[in-house]
Curated annotation (Swiss-Prot):
<dbReference type="InterPro" id="IPR020785">
    <property type="entry name" value="Ribosomal_uL11_CS"/>
</dbReference>
<dbReference type="InterPro" id="IPR006519">
    <property type="entry name" value="Ribosomal_uL11_bac-typ"/>
</dbReference>
<keyword id="KW-0488">Methylation</keyword>
<dbReference type="InterPro" id="IPR020784">
    <property type="entry name" value="Ribosomal_uL11_N"/>
</dbReference>
<keyword id="KW-0694">RNA-binding</keyword>
<keyword id="KW-0687">Ribonucleoprotein</keyword>
<dbReference type="GO" id="GO:0070180">
    <property type="term" value="F:large ribosomal subunit rRNA binding"/>
</dbReference>
<dbReference type="InterPro" id="IPR020783">
    <property type="entry name" value="Ribosomal_uL11_C"/>
</dbReference>
<keyword id="KW-0689">Ribosomal protein</keyword>
<comment type="function">
    <text>Forms part of the ribosomal stalk which helps the ribosome interact with GTP-bound translation factors.</text>
</comment>
<comment type="subunit">
    <text>Part of the ribosomal stalk of the 50S ribosomal subunit. Interacts with L10 and the large rRNA to form the base of the stalk. L10 forms an elongated spine to which L12 dimers bind in a sequential fashion forming a multimeric L10(L12)X complex.</text>
</comment>
<protein>
    <recommendedName>
        <fullName>Large ribosomal subunit protein uL11</fullName>
    </recommendedName>
</protein>
<keyword id="KW-0699">rRNA-binding</keyword>
<dbReference type="InterPro" id="IPR036769">
    <property type="entry name" value="Ribosomal_uL11_C_sf"/>
</dbReference>
<dbReference type="GO" id="GO:0003735">
    <property type="term" value="F:structural constituent of ribosome"/>
</dbReference>
<dbReference type="InterPro" id="IPR000911">
    <property type="entry name" value="Ribosomal_uL11"/>
</dbReference>
<dbReference type="InterPro" id="IPR036796">
    <property type="entry name" value="Ribosomal_uL11_N_sf"/>
</dbReference>
Length: 141
């Protein structure tokens, strides 16, 4: 018989740097999950992606055990890294924060493909380009 899922917790944590301090501790502690076990597992699985923010979906079961699924980094983080900017523009229509090439856009779309609701790479590129546009980052050919 399968274990019954009590709750699903979604967090976005820096890769390899999860610790029991907030937001991890309170989110997991209220469901009785072993916080240190999660932190060690998460850090081990994400240590190769240092510097990125990795979203994680934690399923907590009745017996207080857990499993988690790592997602791809948010498109905005990948776009900022590719453009080499600290943050997007506060007024994307008036001020541009930077630019990325079509090749960089395709690379980001390829990375995000498993988590995007797109059937092909072109659709994924359009989704990522929309995110870039909203951040004030232009896509050049």
């Amino acid at each position: 018989m399968a274990k019954k899922v009590v709750t699903v917790i979604k967090l976005a944590l820096p890769a390899g740097k999860a610790n029991p301090a907030p937001p991890v501790g309170p989110a997991l502690g209220q469901h009785g999950v072993n916080i240190m076990a999660f932190c060690k597992e998460y850090n081990a699985k994400t240590s190769d992606q240092a510097g990125m923010i990795i979203p994680v979906e934690i399923s907590v079961y009745e017996d207080r055990s857990f499993t988690f699924i790592l997602k791809t980094p948010p498109a905005s983080v990948l776009i900022r890294k590719a453009a080499g900017v600290e943050k997007g523009s506060a007024q994307p229509n008036k001020q541009k924060a930077g630019s990325i090439s079509r090749a960089q856009l395709q690379e980001i779309a390829q990375t995000k493909m498993p988590d995007l609701n797109a059937n092909d790479i072109e659709a994924a590129m359009n989704i990522v380009a929309g995110t870039a546009r909203n951040m004030g980052i232009t896509v050049t050919d």
